Amino acid sequence: MALISIEDAKAYLRVDSSDEDATVGILLASAIRLCIDIARLTDDQWEVIDSDAASSDEYTEAELSAIRETMKVAILYTCAYLFEHREEADHHALTMTLRSLLFAIREGAFS
């Protein structure tokens, strides 16, 4: 299971054709990486979040569900922002917004 597929992102962006698939895929990958970095998640933590697991050694079922929903919102927001502002994106503003969105799940220290 991927937390968000290209089809999910295209639906959120209201892109109907396959003409933008490559662009949406690149932006989605960038959005995922940016959100992982801002949330300060390790690759191992992301692997659990992006899987079908109901819980893990690190997260309860409720925590994992809440983290997944928060990450979905942040990733889709980021993908849409990058898609709509291809030419003139304000990455500082985007980063500050993502910090606010991801604050509740943000890890306390860098790994």
Question: Across the structure, where does each feature detected by a protein language model lie?
Answer:
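Divalent metal-cofactor coordination and adjacent catalytic microenvironments
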Residues: 1-111
